[in-house]
From Swiss-Prot:
Predominantly expressed in seed. Expressed in endosperm, embryo and aleurone cells. Also detected in young seedlings, abscission zones, stem branching points. Its main location: nucleus. The lineage of its organism: Eukaryota, Viridiplantae, Streptophyta, Embryophyta, Tracheophyta. Induction: By abscisic acid (ABA) and oxidative stress. Gene3D superfamilies: Antioxidant, Horf6, Chain A, domain2, Glutaredoxin. A motif (Bipartite nuclear localization signal) lies at residues 191-214. Belongs to the peroxiredoxin family. Prx6 subfamily. This is 1-Cys peroxiredoxin PER1. InterPro entries: AhpC/TSA (IPR000866), Peroxiredoxin_AhpC-typ (IPR024706), Peroxiredoxin_C (IPR019479), PRX_1cys (IPR045020), Thioredoxin-like_sf (IPR036249), Thioredoxin_domain (IPR013766). The gene is PER1. The active site is at residue 46.
Length: 216
């Protein structure tokens, strides 16, 4: 799929939202942001997703992470739809802004186009404070996102960033579980970086590349 991808800087577009107008880089500044698009207002899967984002808002807040939605409908449509979202989700308030893109000018620049349906996709970018894309998900219109996986992936990115990307998170990792040390870090460096110690897996190759440690 053409367009911006991992490591690319999100273009500093001026956007109109359900809150106000702003430039994307101003919104991204000094925090991580979950930027997510949906195929359309007043659609079933999207209603459940945006409601779940509202319900999980406290989880993003405590991580210092902002939310920002996007759809190819106008601001008034978004505001009317929010009433349905909040009613269906038992009052969870949609307090995050939703970008309006009725002319479909923004989604191509953010690489949020469904290549099969040639319309707005169910995409999600996790954007760092440097306005660069750190992770992307792209789902077909038939499949809703899993908020727990979004949080898990976000926690992984935050943990790696905290340790200058000298660690990585293994399969099915969750917070408070061991991480692995980057192969770029020598054992001598690892001893200094991780005074709590690390365990090297005893594998047939004897290459010593799989090292687990505890971090916080």
């Amino acid at each position: 799929m053409p367009g911006i991808t991992l490591g690319d800087t999100v273009p500093n577009l001026e956007v109109e939202t359900t809150h106000d107008k702003f430039k994307l880089h101003d919104y991204f500044a000094n925090s991580w942001t979950v930027l997510f698009s949906h195929p359309g207002d007043f659609t079933p899967v999207c209603t459940t997703e945006l409601g779940a984002m509202a319900k999980y808002a406290h989880e993003f807040d405590k991580r210092g992470v902002k939310l920002l939605g996007l759809s190819c409908d106008d601001v008034q449509s978004h505001k009317d739809w929010i009433k349905d979202i909040e009613a269906f989700n038992h009052g969870s308030k949609v307090n995050y802004p939703i970008i309006a893109d009725p002319n479909k000018e923004i989604i191509p620049q953010l690489n949020m186009i469904d290549p099969i349906e040639n319309g707005p996709s169910r995409a999600l970018h996790i954007v760092g404070p440097d306005s660069k894309i750190k992770l992307s998900f792209l789902y077909p219109s038939t499949t809703g996102r899993n908020m727990d996986e979004v949080l898990r992936a976000l926690d992984s990115l935050l943990m790696a960033s905290k340790h200058n990307n000298k660690i990585a998170t293994p399969v099915n990792w969750k917070p408070d579980q061991p991480v692995v040390i980057s192969p770029a870090v020598s054992d001598e460096e690892a001893k200094k970086m991780f005074p709590q110690g690390f365990k090297t897996a005893d594998l047939p190759s004897k290459k010593g590349y799989l090292r687990h440690t505890e971090v916080s």
